[in-house]
From Swiss-Prot:
Keywords: Cytoplasm, NADP, Oxidoreductase, Queuosine biosynthesis. Gene3D superfamilies: 3.30.1130.10. This is NADPH-dependent 7-cyano-7-deazaguanine reductase. It catalyses: 7-aminomethyl-7-carbaguanine + 2 NADP(+) = 7-cyano-7-deazaguanine + 2 NADPH + 3 H(+). The lineage of its organism: Bacteria, Pseudomonadati, Pseudomonadota, Alphaproteobacteria, Acetobacterales. It holds the Pfam family QueF. The keyword Cytoplasm applies. Its EC number is 1.7.1.13. Catalyzes the NADPH-dependent reduction of 7-cyano-7-deazaguanine (preQ0) to 7-aminomethyl-7-deazaguanine (preQ1). It comes from Granulibacter bethesdensis (strain ATCC BAA-1260 / CGDNIH1). The gene is queF. Substrate binds at residues 73-75, 92-93. GO terms for molecular function: preQ1 synthase activity. Belongs to the GTP cyclohydrolase I family. QueF type 1 subfamily. It is found in: Cytoplasm.
């Protein structure tokens, strides 16, 4: 079993926070139940980045759902990747899509969707949604259940 994790560089180690998403290393491990159709959900209710023009902080509730194929994302590396946006200026749409595209590139999942529920800036919340295609049949895919903005709580 340990051989499945021999290539990991972050799990179980003391590592520095990456300075940017481009420097962050996303890692994967073998799917422990290959051939089974199931969904994995990661939720980051306190995601932060910076406005690229003003430098003001932006906040989002990110929900990432995917149906794995051969690989699953190693969660510590995902956490470090997500927190690497904290001091980087990027528009909401760019942050949201970069997260989804990096995970798709790493894992080649059967299916993936992201819901990025951004808190208002200038009085307007921006929500970004994307998925790789139609959800697969036979997999329970619950709603993301992030309420429409009313204090987003």
């Amino acid at each position: 079993m340990a051989e499945n994790y021999a290539g990991l560089t972050q799990l179980g180690q003391t590592v520095s926070q990456p300075a940017s998403p481009d420097q962050a290393v996303l890692e994967k491990v073998p799917n422990p139940t290959p051939g089974k159709a199931y969904m994995i959900r990661f939720t980051a209710p306190e995601f932060t980045s910076l406005c690229p023009l003003t430098g003001q902080p932006d906040f989002a509730h990110i929900v990432l759902d995917y149906v794995p194929r051969d690989w699953i994302v190693e969660s510590k590396s995902l956490k470090l990747f997500l927190t690497s946006f904290r001091n980087v200026g990027s528009f909401h749409e760019a942050c949201s899509m970069k997260i989804a595209e990096r995970v798709v590139s790493l894992l080649d999942p059967v299916w993936l969707r992201i819901g990025a529920y951004w808190y208002p800036r200038g009085g307007i919340p921006i929500d970004v949604f994307w998925q790789t295609g139609s959800p697969p049949d036979g997999v329970w895919i619950p709603a993301q259940d992030v309420p429409g903005y009313r204090g987003r709580g």
